[in-house]
């Protein structure tokens, strides 16, 4: 079945977690998280970057509706999006770090290319 991963949470918690992960990712340029969370975060972050490349007011408002910090949105539109002006998708890279010590979950580093 196509769509999205449930990540073992109710819808509102999952959306809040992914919004926070995307905001942190765009703020810092990289995050360390589990592989499944990173795959969902990657998908949403790439959509935000593609919107930012459009650069119009409507795109800015759409990004503001998802990303939780205005400074991150400003940085996304002013610095990150112009860097990828010539690139069509594939703005992120994932590195496997290995299993997490506590529960053995596969951990990855997600970063901007």
Curated annotation (Swiss-Prot):
<dbReference type="GO" id="GO:0006412">
    <property type="term" value="P:translation"/>
</dbReference>
<dbReference type="InterPro" id="IPR000456">
    <property type="entry name" value="Ribosomal_bL17"/>
</dbReference>
<keyword id="KW-0687">Ribonucleoprotein</keyword>
<protein>
    <recommendedName>
        <fullName>Large ribosomal subunit protein bL17</fullName>
    </recommendedName>
</protein>
<dbReference type="Pfam" id="PF01196">
    <property type="entry name" value="Ribosomal_L17"/>
</dbReference>
<comment type="subunit">
    <text>Part of the 50S ribosomal subunit. Contacts protein L32.</text>
</comment>
<keyword id="KW-0689">Ribosomal protein</keyword>
<comment type="similarity">
    <text>Belongs to the bacterial ribosomal protein bL17 family.</text>
</comment>
<dbReference type="InterPro" id="IPR047859">
    <property type="entry name" value="Ribosomal_bL17_CS"/>
</dbReference>
<dbReference type="InterPro" id="IPR036373">
    <property type="entry name" value="Ribosomal_bL17_sf"/>
</dbReference>
<dbReference type="GO" id="GO:0003735">
    <property type="term" value="F:structural constituent of ribosome"/>
</dbReference>
<dbReference type="GO" id="GO:0022625">
    <property type="term" value="C:cytosolic large ribosomal subunit"/>
</dbReference>
């Amino acid at each position: 079945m196509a769509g999205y991963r449930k990540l073992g949470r109710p819808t509102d918690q999952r959306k809040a977690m992914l919004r926070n992960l995307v905001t942190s990712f765009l703020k810092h340029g990289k995050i360390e998280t589990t592989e499944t969370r990173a795959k969902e975060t990657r998908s949403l972050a790439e959509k935000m970057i593609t919107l930012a490349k459009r650069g119009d007011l409507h795109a800015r408002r759409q990004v503001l509706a998802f990303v939780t910090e205005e400074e991150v949105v400003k940085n996304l539109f002013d610095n990150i999006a112009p860097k990828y002006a010539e690139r069509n998708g594939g703005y992120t890279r994932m590195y496997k770090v290995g299993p997490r010590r506590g529960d053995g979950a596969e951990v990855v580093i997600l970063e901007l290319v």
